[in-house]
């Protein structure tokens, strides 16, 4: 657009009604998201290889109808762009997908699926599927923890939302046995008291953090000694000083690795040693994690790892970086599958 035409366009904006202004702002927001997403796609395509054969020899081959840069492989003669072979290859509304990313990794708390769907004008199931695409692409980078390392576990209640195990049992009780857990409304209906404290329905989430701010969290299947040792062994440097509570598995892990171990109590006066050894940082991490999970009303157990990774990624990346990661991880998986 020429400068004079653009200036005339700006002058005419003063005559817009409030409703027209809102529509204009929405259009600008959509175009901005589309442009940012397209830039990320072109950047990723320029860094990657052919998703069909894995060759790095390619040439530019025009643009797609969505104005994405298309490439042609010089080895297999097939064309591709930055989304080919990725988990968002067939996504129609790339601008709305990018706005879901902005909501998930913005400065404010993420919106609920229903609220975000109303904002974007799409079905709630669409937003839910897009979120799952994003969560599956998230992973924690394992940085070895050194110095004083605080280790503890927090617990989340097992949730079988979406499993449909009771529906299958009632439809075919012979082939589908009765699920071990009651439905939520049956506790009050049958007068069954919920178990208090730690029980078999509480799933452990192992967390570790050092004084440099490096941290890691992982949902464990149980609290057995071998499970905890296998989880912590590749994570903590042997010359680190381990701070934990009195749970025996930590002592066995420290003895196995040969590292120093400081055991802290739960009573006042025993929670700190010389104002240096404590587990207050990891407890604060538990508090922030549970505050993040609380609005979701207990995510399903099979998605807990994704929500934990989401919580950590919110403090480490923004929407643009996350979009790059989704494309890069998807294309890496494709290139591994096509490599000889």
Explain the meaning of each model-derived region.
Residues 1-340:
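Residue-level recognition of single "structural anchor" positions
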